[in-house]
Regions:
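N-terminal active-site segment of His-dependent metallophosphoesterases
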Residues: 1-47, 52
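Residue-level marker for buried hydrophobic side chains located in beta-strands
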Residues: 4, 28-30, 59-60, 139, ...
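Active-site glycine-centered loops adjacent to acidic/histidine catalytic or metal-binding residues
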Residues: 7, 32-33, 62-63, 182, ...
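Short, glycine/acidic-enriched loop or turn micro-motifs at the edges of active sites
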Residues: 9-10, 36, 66, 145, ...
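A general structural motif
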Residues: 25-26, 54-56, 136, 174-175
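Active-site neighborhood of divalent metal-dependent phosphoester bond hydrolases
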Residues: 38, 42-45, 49-130, 165-169
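Acidic, His/Gly-enriched loop-helix segments that form or flank divalent-metal centers
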Residues: 95-196, 200-206, 212-228, 232-234
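A short C-terminal boundary segment appended to hydrolase-like catalytic domains
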Residues: 239-252
Length: 252
């Protein structure tokens, strides 16, 4: 088994329940956004790092990790060069991260700034990669495959920030499909060759899990404050490309 999980946003309870559902030899891929917004970013990161270091989890970078790690990197460069431009860039990235849900992580760690990002988080960031090449030519990344959407400025930023409505995206010749998180939807959804898995776990208590080998989909349903039926569904201009993924629901 090779199971892909989307955004967790501090839902360590859902991650733990999902991991326990599968046999001990199961391999996992996490699509990024472990931190921010939810109740236990710290515990989520610890679990992911433990699984990674045990050789069971491939960790991908999400836009929430990217905001904080780039703030920390600019702060490091400011210290090394005494360049005010780096200092300002660090403050801007850090403020953007806080506006996008980072205050929950600040509270968990008792507060910090770009110069003092906790070692736990930096060690987690050091294990992240941007994409994963799975079996059968299936590519995994946080938000989109490695393509350039001009308004995001670079391929890397597109992979971290793009939305389904920015696509469908051209895939590399050897890639048959791609799997992503990032955009919360009411149900796992295909748009052309792209599968979107994020069900807004931190709000809905729903975490999808897609097996890249058997193509089985499970939704682990825990406690949430918002029914996932209230999340958006993709419609309109891409209707001929959109189809939902059949899944089994497991209450946790």
């Amino acid at each position: 088994m090779l199971i892909v999980f989307p955004d967790l946003h501090g839902r360590s309870d859902l991650l733990e329940a999902a991991i326990q559902h599968y046999p001990q030899d199961t391999q996992f891929v996490f699509l990024g956004d472990a931190i921010d917004r939810g109740p236990d970013s710290r515990g989520t990161v610890r679990q992911l790092v433990e699984l990674h270091d045990a050789g069971r989890m491939t960790l991908l970078c999400g836009n929430h990790e990217w905001m904080l790690l780039t703030a920390a990197e600019f702060a490091r460069q400011a210290q090394e060069t005494d360049d005010e431009a780096y200092h300002q860039a660090a403050l801007e990235r850090f403020a953007n991260w806080e506006r996008n849900g980072g205050t929950s992580v600040q509270e968990e760690f008792g507060g910090f700034n770009p110069d003092t990002v906790p070692t736990e988080l930096l060690e987690y960031f050091s294990r992240l990669q941007l994409l994963f090449d799975g079996p059968g030519g299936v590519l995994c990344s946080h938000a989109a495959p490695p393509a350039l959407v001009q308004r995001y400025g670079s391929v890397e930023e597109t992979m971290l920030w793009a939305r389904p409505n920015d696509g469908p995206f051209a895939l590399p010749s050897e890639v048959t499909a791609s799997v992503h998180g990032h955009t919360p939807l009411a149900q796992p959804t295909w748009v052309g060759q792209h599968l979107y898995l994020d069900l807004g776990a931190f709000l809905t208590g729903a975490l999808s899990a897609f097996d890249l080998e058997s193509l089985e989909m499970i939704v682990f349903q825990g406690q949430g404050s918002v029914p996932r039926e209230h999340l958006p569904e993709l419609r309109s201009g891409q209707s001929n490309l959109i189809r939902t993924q059949t899944c089994t629901v497991v209450e946790v």
